[in-house]
Every structure is written in structure tokens, then in C-alpha cells.
Curated annotation (Swiss-Prot):
SMART domains with a match to the protein in the record: HOX
Compartments it resides in: Nucleus
Organism this protein belongs to: Mus musculus
Pfam families, alphabetized: DUF4074, Homeodomain
GO biological processes: anterior/posterior pattern specification; cartilage development; cell-matrix adhesion; DNA-templated transcription; embryonic skeletal system morphogenesis; glossopharyngeal nerve morphogenesis; Notch signaling pathway; positive regulation of gene expression
Record's keyword terms, sorted: Developmental protein, DNA-binding, Homeobox, Nucleus, Transcription, Transcription regulation
SUPFAM superfamilies, per database record: Homeodomain-like (SSF46689)
Protein's UniProt name: Homeobox protein Hox-D3
Transmembrane helix in keyword set: no
Tissue spec: Detected in adult kidney, but not in other adult tissues tested.
Family of this protein: Belongs to the Antp homeobox family.
Superkingdom of origin: Eukaryota
Motif extent (Antp-type hexapeptide): 161-166
One GO CC term, this protein: nuclear body
């Protein structure tokens, strides 16, 4: 089938060349794996085209030991070739055999079996088989070392989790405080497993003491906090956090009370205008209710800071003579100044309608004689109140009646210029203002 018996010495050199080329190539293919050489490439006895090395001189002999000879010769030639040369030498058996064989020498089954190994990529080159035990043993040794190191690292990592790591800071503090005090700590929440912080459950006795302390002091100093911590069997941190939360709750309650108790329109931002613009408006923090009132502040101390600004007290504490240019605008026949009663710093207008006047330090709108607004500024606090005394009557039944005033002049300019005169100074003196 493969070779005819008539091929003799004429074809012997070609056969030896082909045999040499062929036995180099099976060494390359043997590098893929010794056990799969017979199965993958079909180096079986019926398909073997060339004689083995033992029967190289006799071409007429059979080929019983071809597979064994390939397996024995492959390890000897495999170390000489690299993995990069395997790709280039895969076609050498087909080309060498087709050139030297002369058509009839190349079996059809060999080409069909040599072409399928081309598409799969070549595996990495094997280690030199001269010492097959050492590298083989070295690789598992490395793997075992890596496995041992990984297992040892995992064991060390698992061993590094100590029981004190599972406890939080607060739990350890609670345990320490329980151990030092020797009392029962059942009122506190039990320490959870590996939790960040537990919610503190205060007893009723602790809450009573904390509320009592908060009623007197909203901010605790550290000595008092230490004392409370020892008294209530709590930590300083717990007491500090409780006071912070209690202050926030108090602030929220105050905001809610302010919104509920002050209806719309009675906030300081919506305060009414002055009495000259609104005829029947008065501030009755200390006055009895008048029928024309529109603003009744429920708590005057709450608006103590805005009272001087709301009603312009700074304008009323000025010297009395500064108001003369304002009254110079009225006609002369209608303006009848009254003499000062017992040197009291006050004047009123009888014929003027809707003109603001001073009556002993009380601002009176003469548009409504009996029920008009009265701005009693005696209760207001002002920086200049030391030199100005508002001590006159609040209610004035008529425009021509003056309340009992202080016998001593309260305005410094009045005592300097108007004490000797019975009438007010002439208006032209103050035209330069």
C-alpha cells in the first residue's frame, strides 16, 4: 500500500533524506504531548510511511515498533526547537515529502491528518525533558507553597479579629462603669453584636434628674457634668448628648409656641405705622383699652428691643425748640401758644386739627379729643432717658388741659431759655434750621 517491494537502491538516498526530514518533524509534533502523539497524528502501524531507526537499513521489513520509536525519539529532539519555530515547521513534512517522494510516495492519509493541527494555536513550549522530574516537581511545589501561603494568610486574617474588636466604644464604657460602680446596669440597653452605637434607655429617675437640671441650667459645665454622671451612673458623653437633644427640643417647642400664640398681623415685622399717619392707632402696653386701638401687644417685654425704633423715641427726646420750624408752617392766627404751667416742658395746640403736639412729654394727636391715641412713652427704655423725664399724665380729657408735670424742667434747653419767659420764643429765630 505505502511502498512497493520493487523500490531498491535507486531510491535509497531519497528515502533516507525523507526519513531524516520526517524524523525531525515528529520530534516537533512530539513536543505537544507524548501521550497524544499516536492518537492525534495517527502514527499507527498501517499509516507509517517510513521505517523506524532500528529497521532503517532494511526497507522490506515490517513496522511493528513505529509508535514506540516515535515516542522515544521525540523527547530527544524536542528541546532543540522553540515554540516560535513550531508554527513555521508544521508544513515541513508535507512539503519535504511531496518534493522528495515523487507523488506516489506520499500517502493521502498523511496530508489530511497533518492539516488539522494548523488552525489551533500552538501551546507554550514544554520544559526540557532531560530532567523531567525536577521541573514537574518544581511546579507543584510552587503551587503548594502558594496555597500554603494563601491559607496561612487567611488563617492569620481570621485570627486577627479579636473579641475586643467586636465591642463598640460605648459598650465597653458601659461595662467598665458597671464593673466599677458594682451596681446593676439593667436599665441600659445591652451591647449589640458589632453595632456602632446603641440607643441609651434612660430610666425615669435619670430623666427626672436630667429634666430638673435642664430647668435650672441649659448648659452644663464640665464639673457639674462629671457630678451628674457619677450621680446618675451615666457617662459624660451621654449627658452631653442628652442636653444637646433637649436644647434642640426646647428650641423647637418655643418656635411652635410663638407661631400658635401670635396670630397673623401681630408680629414685630408687621408693626403699625406712626400715629400721624394712622389716626386711631396707639400702643397700649400699659394703658387701659381705648375704643380706637388697633394694636394690642400681648407681651411688651418680647418687643422691648424694637419699641424705641417703632415709635421714634429718639425724635421725642430732642430739645423742644427743634419742633418749632414744623409748627411755623401753620397760619399765624390759628397758632396760639399756651404758657408753660409751673415751668413744665409742654405745649398744646387748640385750633390745629390733626397736628401732633407735645403735652408734658406725651405725644397726643388732637384730631380726636377724647378717644384719640395716646403714646405714653414713660415705660420705654432709651439710652437718653437719664436726662429726660416722662412723668406726666397719660390720659388727657381735653386739649386745653395739661396733666400734672414735674415742677423741675426736664429739657435742658427749656431750663436755659424758656424759664424766664412766659411765652415760647419767636419763630424767626430758628429759620436757619
Amino acid at each position: 500500500m505505502l511502498f512497493e517491494q520493487g523500490q531498491l537502491t535507486l531510491e535509497l538516498p531519497e528515502c533516507t533524506m525523507q526519513k531524516a526530514a520526517y524524523y525531525e518533524n515528529p520530534g516537533l509534533f512530539g513536543g505537544y504531548g507524548y501521550s497524544k502523539a499516536t492518537d492525534t497524528y495517527g502514527y499507527s502501524t498501517p499509516h507509517q510511511p517510513y521505517p523506524p531507526p532500528a529497521a532503517a537499513n532494511s526497507l522490506d521489513s515490517d513496522y511493528p515498533s513505529s509508535a514506540c520509536s516515535i515516542q522515544s525519539s521525540a523527547p530527544l529532539r524536542a528541546p532543540a526547537h522553540k515554540g516560535a519555530e513550531l508554527n513555521g515547521s508544521c508544513m515541513r513534512p508535507g512539503t519535504g515529502n511531496s518534493q522528495g517522494g515523487g507523488g506516489g510516495n506520499q500517502p493521502p492519509g498523511l496530508n489530511s491528518e497533518q492539516q488539522p493541527p494548523q488552525p489551533p494555536p500552538p501551546p507554550p513550549p514544554t520544559l526540557p525533558p532531560s530532567s523531567p522530574t525536577n521541573p514537574g516537581s518544581g511546579v507543584p511545589a510552587k503551587k503548594t507553597k502558594g496555597g500554603l501561603s494563601a491559607s496561612s494568610s487567611s488563617s492569620t486574617i481570621s485570627k486577627q479579629i479579636f473579641p475586643w474588636m467586636k465591642e463598640s466604644r460605648q459598650n465597653s464604657k458601659q461595662k467598665n462603669s458597671c464593673a466599677t460602680s458594682g451596681e446593676n446596669c439593667e436599665d441600659k440597653s445591652p451591647p449589640g453584636p458589632a453595632s456602632k452605637r446603641v440607643r441609651t434607655a434612660y430610666t425615669s429617675a435619670q430623666l427626672v434628674e436630667l429634666e430638673k437640671e435642664f430647668h435650672f441650667n441649659r448648659y452644663l459645665c464640665r464639673p457639674r457634668r462629671v457630678e451628674m454622671a457619677n450621680l446618675l451612673n451615666l457617662t459624660e458623653r451621654q449627658i452631653k448628648i442628652w442636653f444637646q437633644n433637649r436644647r434642640m427640643k426646647y428650641k423647637k417647642d418655643q418656635k411652635a409656641k410663638g407661631i400658635l400664640h401670635s396670630p397673623a398681623g401681630q408680629s414685630p415685622e408687621r408693626s403699625p405705622p406712626l400715629g400721624g399717619a394712622a389716626g386711631h392707632v396707639a400702643y397700649s402696653g400699659q394703658l387701659p383699652p381705648v375704643p380706637g386701638l388697633a394694636y394690642d401687644a400681648p407681651s411688651p417685654p418680647a418687643f422691648a428691643k424694637s419699641q424705641p425704633n417703632m415709635y421714634g423715641l429718639a425724635a421725642y427726646t430732642a430739645p423742644l425748640s427743634s419742633c418749632l420750624p414744623q409748627q411755623k408752617r401753620y397760619p399765624a392766627p390759628e397758632f396760639e401758644p399756651h404758657p408753660m404751667a409751673s415751668n413744665g416742658g409742654g405745649f398744646a395746640s387748640a385750633n390745629l386739627q390733626g397736628s401732633p403736639v407735645y403735652v408734658g412729654g406725651n405725644f397726643v394727636d388732637s384730631m380726636a379729643p377724647t378717644s384719640g391715641p395716646v403714646f405714653n412713652l414713660g415705660h420705654l427704655s432709651h439710652p437718653s432717658s437719664a436726662s429726660v423725664d416722662y412723668s406726666c399724665a397719660a390720659q388727657i380729657p381735653g386739649n386745653h388741659h395739661h396733666g400734672p408735670c414735674d415742677p423741675h424742667p426736664t429739657y435742658t434747653d427749656l431750663s436755659a431759655h424758656h424759664s424766664s419767659q412766659g411765652r415760647l420764643p419767636e419763630a424767626p429765630k430758628l429759620t436757619h434750621l
